Amino acid sequence: MKKIVVFGSSNVDIVVDVERMPQPGETVRGKTMCKLAGGKGANQACACGKLHGQCSFLSAVGCDDSAQLLLDSLEKANVDARAVLRCEETPTGSAHIQVDASGENSIVVVAGANAFCNRSYFEAQKSILLDADYILTQLETPLEDTYDLIEEMK
């Protein structure tokens, strides 16, 4: 079986359903709110783990409740998350998502620990990366370092 490594973001998605999007300076009431495991990288890793079963995830989270939500989600999806960096100095990344009645959304992303998915982190995980048959990444981690990873792992 081919080994897949996903290098990317981990976010807690905070989703609020609203009747309509607020205008600048306006406050609107939310109907419901939920917290979900998310981030493009974590979502891709979970999909690979569920479909393929041989997936490792390289990312960074804080040492908070959001991190535990993400790590539990990865474990449930059969993703090897042992190399996920735990950052004491910054919280887990978050995405604050408003969804209106028509399904349109507006998203604000706070990088948080995802900022530590950088060159020094992927250099420390080189053995995992070199053992991969496929490496999957996205653009929610520091761009310059992500481009370096792609170039180095060609």
Please place each PLM-identified region on the residue numbering:
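Glycine-rich phosphate-binding loop of ATP-grasp-fold ATP-dependent ligases
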Residues: 93-95
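Short, glycine-/polar-rich solvent-exposed loops and beta-turns at beta-strand/coil boundaries
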Residues: 88-90
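Glycine-rich phosphate/adenosyl-contacting loop at the front of the ribokinase-like
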Residues: 1-60, 65-69, 76-79
